[in-house]
Amino acid sequence: MAAKDVKFGNDARVKMLRGVNVLADAVKVTLGPKGRNVVLDKSFGAPTITKDGVSVAREIELEDKFENMGAQMVKEVASKANDAAGDGTTTATVLAQAIITEGLKAVAAGMNPMDLKRGIDKAVIAAVEELKALSVPCSDSKAIAQVGTISANSDETVGKMIAEAMDKVGKEGVITVEEGTGLQDELDVVEGMQFDRGYLSPYFINKPETGAVELESPFILLADKKISNIREMLPVLEAVAKAGKPLVIVAEDVEGEALATLVVNTMRGIVKVAAVKAPGFGDRRKAMLQDIATLTGGTVISEEIGLELEKATLEDLGQAKRVVINKDTTTIIDGTGEEAAIQGRVAQIRQQVEEATSDYDKEKLQERVAKLAGGVAVIKVGAATEVEMKEKKARVEDALAATRAAVEEGVVAGGGVALVRVAAKLASLTAQNEDQNVGIKVALRAMEAPLRQIVSNAGEEPSVVANNVKAGDGNYGYNAATEEYGNMIDFGILDPTKVTRSALQFAASVAGLMITTECMVTDLPKGDAPDLGGAGGMGG
């Protein structure tokens, strides 16, 4: 086992604080409308330019191992805030630095670290309740656009695009961000359920100008098996032909004689048919077939549950207003499934999302919810260069996460004002002893730090602005972009309650642990291996 280097008491805390300050100082230059960019060098390719706190934090490793421990613990704050709310990483880092700095001063002055931590925790619990009380629901498109704009560094086009996407696909719909090919941002919306499987034969195409199959009010046959024998399908085909409607077949595969017969029927105009493979593989395919069945009011023909294709009737088939199939995708528009059944299925999948452990599974389940509940919107980010593209895409993703958080828990006044108001309301909060009271004061003083940092980045004097804001009440604050005082809600400067709450909770959690640190242990640096001397008896 390698030898260890151990530091105690103040020595350890001073080193740790130095690491915290290096990381936090690098991150906090990005805060606010006048925050600056940080350039990150990469081992290959062009440097990355970013204004995203967590991206900066992730890049920082310090040479001194004790300082690095401090930096890594604050990096954890930014990562946790990013995971929970998708934004607010810089705010969380600034809060953590402020609590640690003030807390360690109190420890150096002889306060009991455990009582300080209890005081900080008590203040944060009370502050979260106050934030919830200040929060107002974020339901209209204008508020959603404002939240997106602020999170995307005052880029109004991004805010409007996110609001439009949410309008189109609903609050539950999936909105994804991709790199576009042009200079302009674009929004693509797919209404209805779309999955990535195209037609099995180009002979099904009935719209040659678009290269697509478009069927109006078709029946939809869902089969969890390979279909190669046409005899199995004859009863269904005859029933559909009598009804005079088209048929879409979604099966594990349709091949051989069965596919050839369907093509011939289509070309002769006996019955309009199109066949596609079922989406997904294995268990996910079974689940997605069941989703389509719920959406269209049909039944999945599966031998596992004793249903045979030969015995299928029109009652087993789903229906939709329209189905569009092209080379790579199939879109089912306005399925005729019962609303109650669809909502039940959505609730069931949501439960699976809660229980899912991997991010990949969660993402796939969320996509299924969106396909059932509304639709899918894709924001394609446009930019002139690769470097700008990466920076802009990160901003749009942050803005999207912030708007989701706002819809979930509401919004409070932005620009650090909400935390200043909360601190003022909790000024009379007390605890069991004097050391805990100092802990409460440490937390309340730290709540001013985001406002002060925003002002500092805008080139103004933080103390003057902080005092002016404290002299006002409600949503009165300072707009750093225009250097005006006024109502933050009227200015359109809103922060999602969830983002502010998460930032405070994670910052206090890690800061409280760091304040109570008394000893730090790390590996001693390995010395260079000694040179081997010349072998005996050999001339030099």
From Swiss-Prot:
Which PROSITE patterns does the record associate with it? CHAPERONINS_CPN60 (PS00296)
Organism classification:
Bacteria, Pseudomonadati, Pseudomonadota, Gammaproteobacteria, Enterobacterales
Question: What are the entry keywords?
Answer: ATP-binding, Chaperone, Cytoplasm, Isomerase, Nucleotide-binding
What this protein catalyses is:
ATP + H2O + a folded polypeptide = ADP + phosphate + an unfolded polypeptide
Q: Where in the cell is it found?
A: Cytoplasm
Residues engaged in binding ATP: 30-33, 51, 87-91, 415, 479-481, 495
Gene from which the chain derives: groEL
Q: Which InterPro entries match?
A: Chaperonin_Cpn60_CS (IPR018370), Cpn60/GroEL (IPR001844), Cpn60/GroEL/TCP-1 (IPR002423), GroEL-like_apical_dom_sf (IPR027409), GROEL-like_equatorial_sf (IPR027413), TCP-1-like_intermed_sf (IPR027410)
Pfam families xrefs: Cpn60_TCP1 (PF00118)
User: What is the protein name given in its UniProt record?
Assistant: Chaperonin GroEL
Query: Is Signal among the key words of this record?
Result: no
Keyword Isomerase appears in the UniProt entry: yes
Provide a Gene Ontology MF annotation, just one.
isomerase activity
PANTHER family linked = 60 KDA HEAT SHOCK PROTEIN, MITOCHONDRIAL (PTHR45633)
